Each structure stands twice: as structure tokens, then as C-alpha cells.
Amino acid sequence: MTSQNLAGKRVLITHADAFMGPTLCAVFAEHGAIVIADSSPLLAPEAPAALVESAGIVDILVVNLALPAPSTPAAEVSDAEWSQVFATLVDPLPRLVRAVLPQMIERRSG
């Protein structure tokens, strides 16, 4: 990754306030990218599409999905807790990709 190839690129970073989000934002910005840092939970099925629409042109999508480290022992994780983890860390991924791909395909870039 060089500053030259990131200069002016619009980078959408999800969960920008969690896990690797702050560092990702800083590194992309240091290399000249325009960082669109989002910290919304993206739990609602329509949230990823709304985020991409509000971001406008997205050259690079960084799907940083995070949640606090679990404290429940693995043998005691309930179905509800597992569903919440899955909804936070997995469900947004295909929704984000589906939302951003059409514009990238149209531009033949991204």
C-alpha cells in the first residue's frame, strides 16, 4: 500500500470505532485516502445499503466488523448470544458487498 495509489480514494470503513477500526482509519488517511468512517451497528437488514448510499462513491470497502470480547465460556453460550454475534459479525458482510458492488462494477474499479 502506497500513498500514490490511495491518494484521493474514498475508503468506507465499518465499525470504525472498534477493534482495528481506529488504526485502519489512521493508516488510510496517512496514505492520502478520503476515509468515510462509520460506527453504526449495521444490524438492520437495510442498514448496509443505506450506509453505502449515504457514502456515495466508494473505491475501497473495508468490512471491519467487531464487538467486545465475549466473557461467556464457550460451553455456556446461549443460542440468543450466538445469534447476536452472528448478526453483528457475519450478516452485514454480504449485505455490504451487495450494496457496493454495482457501483464498482459500473466504474470497473473498486
Task: Go through the PLM ranges and name each one.
Residues 44-58:
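Conserved amphipathic alpha-helix within the SDR
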Residues 3-36:
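Canonical Rossmann dinucleotide-binding motif of NAD(H)/NADP(H)-dependent dehydrogenases/reductases
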Residues 72-74, 78-86:
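Substrate-binding pocket helix/loop in short-chain dehydrogenase/reductase
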Residues 97-98:
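A short, exposed helix-loop element centered on a Lys and neighboring polar residues
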Residues 36-46:
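Rossmann-fold cofactor-recognition segment
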Residues 9, 57-58, 105-110:
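Active-site loop of short-chain dehydrogenase/reductase
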